[in-house]
Structures are given as C-alpha cells and as structure tokens.
Design a protein with these regions (language model features):
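Short glycine/proline-enriched coil/turn segments at helix->beta-strand junctions
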Residues: 19-20, 51-56, 94-97
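Feature marks short, surface-exposed loop/turn motifs that line or immediately flank catalytic pockets
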Residues: 11, 65-69
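Short coil-to-beta-strand
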Residues: 17-18, 59-61
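N-terminal, well-ordered alpha-helical segments
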Residues: 40-47, 86, 90
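Glycine-rich phosphate-binding loop and adjoining helix at the ATP-binding site
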Residues: 58, 68-97
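Short beta-strand segments
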Residues: 6, 60-64
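Phosphate/pyrophosphate-binding loops at sites that engage ATP/ADP/AMP, CoA/4′-phosphopantetheine
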Residues: 42-59
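Short glycine-rich, Thr/Ser-proximal phosphate-binding strand/loop in the N-terminal lobe
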Residues: 2-40, 44, 73-74
Length: 97
C-alpha cells in the first residue's frame, strides 16, 4: 500500500493504492499558490490518511518541471511559478523522516 500525490497548477490529487495497484482512496483539493503551503498540505493529507489506515505508508509525489541534477532545483515548471527554483525533493525528504 502507498500514497501518491499529483501536484498541478490548480489541484493536488491524492490517491492510496493497494499492493495490487487497486485504488482504495482518491481526493482532489485546490493547490495553493505558495511553496510552503503545498508542502504543508501534502504532509497534512498524508498524516490524515495514515491515521485513518492506522499505518505508516511510503509517499510519492509528482509535479510539473524537472529536477536539475546539478543544483537539485526544479526548473521548467509550466504554470507553477511557485515551485520554480525550489528544492522540492529535499524538502519532502525532511518532512517524512
């Protein structure tokens, strides 16, 4: 079982997948236009789902743009200026330790 997030320009969609790949939960919320708020929302949703399921789960996040291997920053994120030049991956790893 795992939790996945799809961060877009207008929404954050969360899903819980069973080990078989079967979807057991899906929810869509508005995406805030501020980096720290996006991180906070994902952490909050994850905690809510883990409490509901009574277990800690792996979390995956996809978002527009690419990670620069040289800098670790996000670049080329169309319509998502609030995550441009941010260290999304490093920040998430700190939140989920």
């Amino acid at each position: 079982m795992q939790i996945g997030f799809d961060v877009g320009a207008t929404k954050i969609e969360s899903v819980v997948l069973e080990d078989t790949g079967q979807e057991s939960f899906r929810e869509r919320t508005d995406c805030p236009k501020e980096y720290d708020s996006i991180i906070s929302n994902i952490v909050e949703i994850t905690k809510k789902l883990e409490t509901k399921l009574n277990k800690s789960l792996p979390v995956g996040v996809c978002h527009p743009g690419v990670h620069s291997p040289q800098t670790g920053l996000i670049k080329n994120a169309p319509n998502c200026y609030w995550i441009e030049k941010k260290t999304f991956s490093k920040r998430f790893k700190r939140c989920f330790r």
